[in-house]
Amino acid sequence: VTDLSTATVRLGPAGLVLDGLEEALLCASLFYFRLPREVWEARLAQVRATGYHAIDVYLPWNFHETAPGEWDFAGRRDVAAFLDLAHEAGLAVVARPGPYICSEWDGGALPSWLGLETEIGLRQAEPRFLGHVRAWFDRAMPILAERQWGRGGAVVAVQLENELDFFDTEDRHAYMTALRDMAVGHGIDVPLIACAGQGDLVGATGGVEGIAPAFNFYPDDRSAFVEPEVRRYADLVAERGLPLLVTETNRSHTTLRRLLVSGATLLAPYLQASGYDLGYTPSVGNWGDPGGFMTHDYDFGGYLSPVGEARPETAEARVLTAFTRTLGPALAKARTTEAEGVHSVSVATSASPSRLVLDGGGTVTGVPNLTGEAGTASVATGLGEFAIALAPHSCALIVQGLPLAGFGLPGVLRFASADLVGADESGLRFASRVPSTVVFSTEGETPIVAELDAPAVGEPKRYTVQSGSTAWEVVVMHPEDVHAPDGPVEPTGVTGEPEALGGAVRLALETRTGSTEAHELAPVSEAVGVLRGRTHYATSVEGIAELLIEGAGDIVDLAFDGVAAQTFARFGATVRVPVAGAGSFEAVVETWGHANFDDTRLPGLAIGSLRGLGRVWSVAASEDVSALWTVEGGDQWAGDPAPLRSLGGWSSTRIGRPATYRRSLPVDGTSHHALHLDGLERPCEVAVDGASRTVSPNDPWVHLAPGEGRDVAVTMPHWPGSGGAAALLRLDAIRDWQVEPQPDTALIGLAGRESAGDTVAFPLELEAGEEFWIDVLVPAGGRSLRFEGSQVRVSAFAHGELLGRVWTDDANRPRFTGGDPGRLWLPGAWNTGGVRLLVRGTIGDGRPVLSGMTAAPTPE
């Protein structure tokens, strides 16, 4: 039985209460696995310097179980050391061990080899999956349990799973109960939470006792409807006696202020402290068309850049955290409501602004300016109307009726349009970028109004506001001058321009061993040990006119008779490839990453989807099957006997209602076939011999195993002119493959070999399909590396690690999202004077060329 008597973390209406202190908490994402160990301490100090109280940190399962049964918690995987550093920095930690984390990380942290187990239920209450999770939790949870807040550590809450309400979990209650029991069994006694990605608190928690709901809000920062949405969830959890915990949201402090006045007591903007995906760790995701590659540079515009540069939002962070510290328990215990009295706003603002009724007296009203222009508003009070100035992209926090006795001061702060960032016996301190108004009163005296000028940076304005015999000392400072609790911090910006690099040496070093193994059919990469890296395939295509490739991903380079033919990244979509009389076929398939989110529009976007060349077929025959489909009644008026039409050819005024087309396909009963619904514009349901599946316009193919296809029904919403051609392809499997696995460890091993070479200069021209190694000299210190060119992929290595990959301008390149696709980071502690590059040319309209390379200093 877990002893709760020593716990010093309490979850109540005021939020996470640490050692009895009731205060709204600001929490920054800071991920050890996206940083070299050498900078952990400095980044933690940077977060502390913004005034944030806490960090949230994922623990990626597959970062620690690097292969089945192979565990690594050393070096930059030493999460225990990171948590200890966070504690030493004075930061609380919300730990998020998954098992699934999303985070735009390879596979959402689920090990890719899980997908090799047939019928395993990922993120389900399924025994095999839970057995693997137990092995992970058996290692991760003791690390967290030993470092809980009540035991001298930093961990104040543990999040189970991540945004489960986005996923089709069959028995959420059973699944989340199993995770809860594992955590509690390892001695976790701080609050357990589960975050909802789209507001479904039961979908996220499973309705399990002992797991508190939290919410991830990602509104458009310019939306007028943030406040009423957030208040709705504040009311929902208040009915359960719980606080509104926002475990992820946008990074803008304007938006954070709007959430604060709408009832949030934990504000954890996602990725205030950006990072970098070192190694083969980015994911593929659905932020593209619909698929996309996540960049190694992991940056959503937070207040710290991936390389540690402090951005302007750090000043806004210090102001907001000073505001929450100043109001303390009164703010944490406040009740949110719709604001009254805000009117005549000259700029776009909230459709329903929020007001906090402070515990012990007073209110805080949020008045947003959702535009880039300065604005004004009027606020009605018991003292009359006050006009306030609104800075661009801001949310004024108007304090009214605040008793000052708790600060050792007389009277009441009746009104303040500047941010209250400090108060004690010496007076009150405010921050503002615009002119502001404060009003004080004491009992029996007429309220005194003071108009305050906007201060310049480094030039605070000082006032003595007097009412009768009572005086208040007031200081108004620019937000840039507001300090964190530990005092002022030196800026961490960078000076120095990018330097063009030369001094390249092309190495006489092989890019693969050439040692292959025989396989009857092309295996998936994971089956031959390539959990990260690439796989080489070769076979004969003598006498074959066309190939059909199903499920290939992520980056596929094809060659016939040693000549580059195609490069594509189609996220597993089926591809037809003409052979054109070739004799041999080669493919290099590189894993960019595994899907971090579950999206069924493309095979490679599904959680648990595997990588490699997929299934490769020769097209033995093709037949047009666009005609002779019967149209069934249902929501249409087609009668019996059913009329014959072409697929999609029914005419009806009942647009949008389902129309079902049915026919028997001319399958031979012994071969594999593929049905191609060419021109499909919307998802449709295809029932093959009674078994239904959804077919997406992004991959309009249906594979038919031998014997399937005697009865095919296609159901789609009726829309005039939305029909298309249909073709049936008869397939024969391509056999007798030679396969060379080249996992990340093999590539990194090659990158570390000594080799002679010849000096070369930029621009470097390559042939399509050609690849080689080059060494490039780099100036000392941390560096941002950039590459110029076209139709070239670059993998950069240093310090025994892959720094990252860049794909220069190329029509075959997919969309990159999540950060800067052209930047790689060489940390200063890893810089020994150079980097090793593996460069590969891709086929396209022109000749591949790496035109140049630059290195800019980073603030290490």
Model-derived regions, located:
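Aromatic- and glycine-enriched glycan-recognition loops and surfaces
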Residues: 32-49, 68-85, 174-175, 551, ...
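N-terminal carbohydrate-binding accessory modules
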Residues: 1-54
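Aromatic-lined ligand-binding clefts that engage carbohydrates, nucleic acids, or primary amines
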Residues: 545-560, 585, 665-690, 712-716, ...
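Aromatic- and acidic-residue-enriched carbohydrate-binding clefts of CAZyme catalytic domains
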Residues: 21, 58-63, 67-70, 75, ...
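Aromatic-lined substrate-binding rim segments of carbohydrate-active enzymes
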Residues: 40-106, 180, 184
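Substrate-binding/catalytic cleft of secreted carbohydrate-active enzymes
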Residues: 4, 95, 100-132, 138-267
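Carbohydrate-binding surfaces of carbohydrate-active enzymes
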Residues: 133-142, 151-154, 159, 172-173, ...
